[in-house]
Amino acid sequence: MYTQTLYELSQEAERLLQLSRQQLQLLEKMPLSVPGDDAPQLALPWSQPNIAERHAMLNNELRKISRLEMVLAIVGTMKAGKSTTINAIVGTEVLPNRNRPMTALPTLIRHMPGQKEPVLHFSHVAPIDCLIQKLQQRLRDCDIKHLTDVLEIDKDMRALMQRIENGVAFEKYYLGAQPIFHCLKSLNDLVRLAKALDVDFPFSAYAAIEHIPVIEVEFVHLAGLESYPGQLTLLDTPGPNEAGQPHLQKMLNQQLARASAVLAVLDYTQLKSISDEEVREAILAVGQSVPLYVLVNKFDQQDRNSDDADQVRALISGTLMKGCITPQQIF
């Protein structure tokens, strides 16, 4: 009964999404302005970029419906504990932790029953390969002394630079926690190096969710449970302060808007900081289009003069989140 109802609802949702796509295709064929009575042209309230963005949104929803996939986007500042939270949900360490921004590109972590060892798929690696070729030439021509002045060159960065000089490309497939850690760390160091060498990182090539890296692994807490239709996927998003790249804010907003729900990880000790404010603004920009939840991390660092749990919920719900989330959605 439950499975049949779910199937019928998904079929109806898919029909409505396909109908919306057809309507957009009709809009694409219409002129962007029409003659007015007195004025030569009257602008219509849509544009080609707007239509393209709507197409991307509908395609993303169709992809989720076809897989019955629930995508929970997780957002937070660099030190709020976002990676730790994701690792806790998965039940094993699938994301590395370093004392620097670690999510240059959004990453999907998908529950895959029976997949005990994590595997990372990075099929859309071509833009990274092109970037490596550009960086290879820049490294040959650059002043290393100047580079060390603008970039912290630790052992990981030095290994990456050596890899670029040798022309070693990224793989499309990584099996096991350590190879995955190495890939993700290298991607983030690649962002830092590209910025230092004044080379544009191809963020736009990874705007579509089907192009970003995907980690597949069995979530420990879901192992052995009765099988139900559907799939749970976490989306690790770049925080607004990740990698010092302001234009990542647009990518963050797009990814949040396309998720099934959003979980914001806030640092209890930094609730009124600028960085946490940027996270809250990104969440508020989503509005009521997706369900919102908040996880307050590091609450154990309170002292006897600190607000209690109910006071913190009231602060976040009312003052910080401007009433767009109820205290019951704050944990």
Regions found by a protein language model. Name each.
Residues S66-F331:
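Globular "head" domains of long coiled-coil molecular machines
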Residues E53-S66, M70:
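Pre-Walker A adenine-sensing motif
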Residues M1-P49:
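Charged, amphipathic alpha-helical linker segments immediately N-terminal to NTP-binding catalytic cores
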